[in-house]
Structures are given as structure tokens and as C-alpha cells.
Amino acid sequence: MKTYNTDEIKNIALLGSKGSGKTTLAEAMLLECGVIKRRGTIEAKNTVCDYFPVEKEYGYSVFSTVFNCEFNGKKLNVIDCTGADDFVGNAYTALGVCDTGVIVLDAEYGVEVGTRNIFRTTEQLRKPVLFALNQIDGEKADYDNLMEQMREVFGPKVVAVQFPVQAETQRSEERRVGKECRSR
């Protein structure tokens, strides 16, 4: 087993409302880091993090699960936290040992009550937060409205560091249609 210096270890909590995509993000991370060869899905009941029978039965995380992987020479210790309100204590506990929180938002539902509560906790614990937007290609997702909502709820410090491809495509299409309407 490789030995890491403390500055090479990052402890991250995946946070968010139930069904926002935390476990799906965990699967993508494990795949990208080469820990698994095939990404599991909630529907197939074969994810690394949801292995208890009750989680497979319910289709969502009941317990927080720890996994680790190496990325760019850094060891990532990640806690996939449950988003169910009944088990939110697991998320609070995870934040106590993590350096950073990654709050996953389902773009179709926007900022949910559970997301607000988790964000408040990260502020109280003075933990830096990164937002990951999931389901951005969903039928009801509106990237621009979601960003506006996030700035209203979480403050003006919310900044996009990556833009979804379809958001630019959507804006380009809106500009094209607008030009056509004006030229008539």
C-alpha cells in the first residue's frame, strides 16, 4: 500500500438531497480513478456504495459509505452521505472529518430544503463547498434559472467553473431565434 504525505490526502463528503445523484457521482469517481471497470447504477442495484440489502430495496442510501481512490497523485477519502432526511445525522458527522463538501444538486428540482440545511451546516463548520449539478440534461432542467436560484439562496459567491454544453447550445439557439424574429 502506498504511503501518502498528509498534504496528499483529501477528505471529501458528497452531500445533497435524497436522489440528487451522490452515489452516481461516487460511481463515476471510482470508474475515472480506475478502481472499478464498470459503473454501477441505482436501478441495477449494483453500486459500490449502496451494498446493504435495505439500500438496494429502497433504491437510495441509508448509510454513509466511505471509499478511497487516487487521482492525480492525491489520495481521496470520500464519504458518500445519505440524503434522506431521516438519516441526515450521517452527513453532519461526515462533515466533521472532511476537508470539503461537494453538494450535489438535481438540476430538475433545483435547491431543495435538505440542500439548504446541509449548506447551512457547512457554513457553521466553516467547510469549503463545491456544487456539482446533476441531471442538467433533464427535460425540466434550466441551467440559467438554477444558477440564479443558487445565487439567491447561497449568495453571490456562487460561480460557475464549467458550463454544460447544452446551456451554450440553448443560448445560441435562443439568439438565433431572436435574430430571426427581429428580422421579420
Regions inferred by a protein language model and the residue ranges of each:
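P-loop NTPase catalytic nucleotide-binding module
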Residues: 1-20, 38-39, 106-176, 183-184
